[in-house]
Amino acid sequence: MADSYLHAPTLVRATTPLVQCLTNAVVMQFTANALLAIGASPAMVDTPAESFDFAGVADGVLINAGTPSAEQYAGMERAIEGATAAGTPWVLDPVGVGGLAERSAFLRRAVDKHPAAIRGNASEIVALAGLGAGGRGVDATDDVADAVEAAQVLARRTGGVVAVTGAEDLIVSRGRVSWLKSGDPMLQLVIGTGCALGAVTAAYLGATQDTDIDPHDAVVAAHAHLGAAGRIAATRATAPGSYAVALIDALHQLDRNQLANLTHLREENR
């Protein structure tokens, strides 16, 4: 159903999905606020002793390797094991893959554990698939269009959904390719918007897991929600500081009509 993604925000707000975030220290507060704004419940449970059990009761799990330590690597591995055992959808955000050997090895092992979704920029997705070297730090040096093959490779390997963010977002799963035009350039000037999107994606997958909304459409909805909110925020703010606040407000206030009017979605046959 072409517009099924429009129904997903209502489910998120109605169910308040619990999202376990194993994410980087730079973005933790912003990520938690973004989840609260969309109607989800954040939990930053990342220690090895607790992450397995918590992944079993969470509705969704985010694995983000932005600022990893030895303890967090262990916690992420345990959370993946717990999510897999419980059938909890988990999202892999491969921050900085390609440039650092230990991080890249961990992230590539994680791919083989079948995340429900992978979300990254074009250079991260290309590097994760083994088709490129990665970007410049956490910034992409590849265009989204250059990552189509890599996204399809990863979707086949995991059986899940792969999202590539950029000026136009790409969402790929086995048999489907969607292009989503939304967002605003100001999003790139606020640290943590991409990382928060990974958490929002986990919330959407958790809220829609036992519904007739396909995981592909849930991932589209997550990206549409943040992108539309980004556009609204740009009309209310003139600089990055005020934009960050306006973005949280817009995430909370977004309604179905705004989502439909501020999102341009097209499906492509490949």
Swiss-Prot record:
Residues reported in the UniProt entry to bind substrate: 44, 192
Binding residues annotated for ATP, in chain numbering: 119, 165
Coiled coil stretches, renumbered: none
Top EC category: transferase
MF annotations from Gene Ontology: ATP binding; hydroxyethylthiazole kinase activity; magnesium ion binding
Reaction catalysed by this enzyme: 5-(2-hydroxyethyl)-4-methylthiazole + ATP = 4-methyl-5-(2-phosphooxyethyl)-thiazole + ADP + H(+)
Keyword Iron-sulfur: no
InterPro entries documented for this protein: Hyethyz_kinase, Ribokinase-like
Functional pathway: Cofactor biosynthesis; thiamine diphosphate biosynthesis; 4-methyl-5-(2-phosphoethyl)-thiazole from 5-(2-hydroxyethyl)-4-methylthiazole: step 1/1
Cofactor needs: Mg(2+)
Database matches in SUPFAM superfamilies: Ribokinase-like (SSF53613)
E.C. code: 2.7.1.50
Pfam families the record matches: HK
A single GO BP: thiamine diphosphate biosynthetic process
Alphabetic keyword roster: ATP-binding, Kinase, Magnesium, Metal-binding, Nucleotide-binding, Thiamine biosynthesis, Transferase
Xref: HAMAP family: Thz_kinase
Family: Belongs to the Thz kinase family.
Protein name per Swiss-Prot or TrEMBL: Hydroxyethylthiazole kinase
Name of the gene: thiM
